[in-house]
């Protein structure tokens, strides 16, 4: 069964070193479980690296059995079985049974061909899975009223073809598991990722982390871990919540007026940066004790959103942020995620071609 875990990484710009390029490819395909930043060019190559350079890259279509591959990299047959299973699932290597040995070849006869084949499979399978996800997402123009933050995270996704439905579960549970949203050590009875995905998919407005935790009766840290995975997959995005600014500004104004007084509000509190009439209305409302959230919202209506953010910040508050599905419907999400996948696959193909070229020198 096809299973692939992709991690987008900066290109090894200009490098023609086979070792550097191959380790970059191995890390991008998550074939070795380690932190990419923990490896540098002075470290000893991984066992998988030694296996590729000692066999499959030298003679990709010769047909190598597991014992020969193990001899190249110094791994036991059990360890090699696990490595080859992962390579077959990722689509880099194909195998056939000859006699009592499984014979392995690099697909397509070169690293570039193998990665291109892998990319075609990955895109089609992800398209199928995103179509399943699209069925959960309700159409909503309102959801996208506010511009998203200009932040792009490193793309990280698990792609797996549809697996069998788990006993006592439904297809959504299988989808969450196959996309890796339950985490690597998720328990079978844990459906938090499913509940969060459904909650966001059915919402017309961004939802804060705190609100999600309260609605689902879960700890904030557990909810945050699932949110991080959804962000890395580009399914959701973080967005400012301007409709909450008036509420937070009001609370900060009242707190700071009681603690520091009018002069501080006008000077260091930021009211002095606003139009004089706006400042007077706010101060007057505080003194007369008739200021409310609705009045603050009306007073700040003509103030640019960036200046509202600045005011909240100088008053000691923080801009409220929430999370939303990153599109008005399922089709937009599908296109968004596939575009990120296409970019990652293009990088993989470019590096794979460089690996092939470096071997010819």
Per-region residue spans from a language model:
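Short acidic, hydrophobic short linear motifs in intrinsically disordered regions
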Residues: 60-72, 203-215
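DNA-contacting interfaces and partner/effector-binding or oligomerization modules
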Residues: 85-89, 97, 107-112, 116-117, ...
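Amphipathic alpha-helical dimerization/coiled-coil segments
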Residues: 113-160, 260-361
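Short amphipathic alpha-helical interaction segments
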Residues: 74-89, 217-232, 238
